Amino acid sequence: MARVKRGNVARKRRNKILRLARGFQGSNGSLFRTANQRVMKALCNAYRDRRRRKRDFRRLWIARINAAARINGVSYSRLIGGLKKADVRINRKMLAQLAVMDPKSFTSVVTSAKS
């Protein structure tokens, strides 16, 4: 069997990793071994944090809605329960936007949930 020289393939693989590691500090962006470790870690963190971001934003929306609801004299859980009973189909993201950008219309939503 003929000998296989891996020059082009190996260089392409290493350059791909070094391209992904561009901007990393020190040897993490310039030496293949350390860059490979940093890139693998970065990709793992990115995968995990894409899922975590969804949770974090939902927590932020709930905190904002709760704060605005308490200003209007109702707790978050009672507000959400009231909205479900009143058949108001508005999600937490939109409620949080209303609470921050347009408090008057948020107050009208709260009054519809109270009744």
UniProtKB/Swiss-Prot annotation:
This is Large ribosomal subunit protein bL20. The gene is rplT. PROSITE patterns: RIBOSOMAL_L20 (PS00937). It comes from Prochlorococcus marinus (strain MIT 9313). GO terms for cellular component: ribonucleoprotein complex; ribosome. Gene3D superfamilies: 6.10.160.10, Ribosomal protein L20. The lineage of its organism: Bacteria, Bacillati, Cyanobacteriota, Cyanophyceae, Synechococcales. The keyword Ribosomal protein applies. Belongs to the bacterial ribosomal protein bL20 family. One of its GO terms (biological process) is ribosomal large subunit assembly. GO terms for molecular function: rRNA binding; structural constituent of ribosome. InterPro entries: Ribosomal_bL20, RIBOSOMAL_L20_CS, Ribosomal_protein_bL20_C. Pfam families: Ribosomal_L20. Keywords: Ribonucleoprotein, Ribosomal protein, RNA-binding, rRNA-binding. It comes from the Bacteria. Binds directly to 23S ribosomal RNA and is necessary for the in vitro assembly process of the 50S ribosomal subunit. It is not involved in the protein synthesizing functions of that subunit. CDD domains: Ribosomal_L20.
